[in-house]
């Protein structure tokens, strides 16, 4: 879970996409919170805010889950919620990438950056943590039956 928190936090600070302008100009970079235009200006985009909120809540829930190690059922339910939020982030990103949800601040062809893969990596890490917590819960139940 700690790796999932770190990966989510890194995803907040690195660009998730780039937009090559249709005419002449430099590429604009898309972050989870907004767009850095080719001229160096920062535009907080209403289109990108859901990406920021989803990834931030995912990181916070993953961090909270670490400290709930004594309550495995709550841990598993928070892991499920975290995975749902990460899937929602991926869907929102794909909709932006395909142009179904346009970014009004810049126009052009959108490309994928490396940081767009980080929430997917985090999703895999949370799924692995969920499996580990579930296995621990089964082990504890089996030990209780033996007594």
Role assignments for model-derived ranges:
Residues 90-147:
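Alpha-helical transmembrane segments of multi-pass integral membrane proteins
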Residues 9-10, 66, 91:
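Hydrophobic residues within the alpha-helical transmembrane core of Major Facilitator Superfamily
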Residues 1-5, 73-80:
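Alpha-helical transmembrane segments and their helix-start/interface "positive-inside/aromatic belt" motifs
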Residues 49-65:
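Hydrophobic alpha-helical transmembrane segments
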Residues 23-43:
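Perimembrane loop-to-helix junctions flanking transmembrane segments
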Residues 77-91:
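Transmembrane alpha-helical segments of multi-pass membrane proteins
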């Amino acid at each position: 879970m700690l790796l999932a928190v770190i990966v989510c936090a890194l995803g907040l600070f690195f660009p998730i996409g780039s937009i090559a302008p249709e005419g002449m100009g430099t590429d604009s970079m898309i972050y989870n919170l907004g767009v850095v235009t080719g001229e160096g200006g920062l535009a907080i985009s209403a289109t990108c805010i859901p990406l920021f909120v989803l990834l931030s809540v995912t990181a916070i829930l993953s961090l909270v889950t670490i400290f709930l190690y004594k309550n495995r059922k709550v841990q598993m339910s928070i892991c499920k919620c975290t995975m749902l939020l990460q899937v929602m982030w991926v869907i929102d990103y794909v909709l932006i990438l395909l142009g179904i949800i346009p970014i009004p601040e810049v126009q052009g062809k959108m490309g994928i950056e490396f940081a767009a893969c980080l929430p997917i990596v985090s999703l895999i890490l949370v799924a692995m943590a969920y499996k580990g917590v579930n296995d621990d819960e089964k082990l504890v139940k089996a030990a209780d039956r033996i007594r």
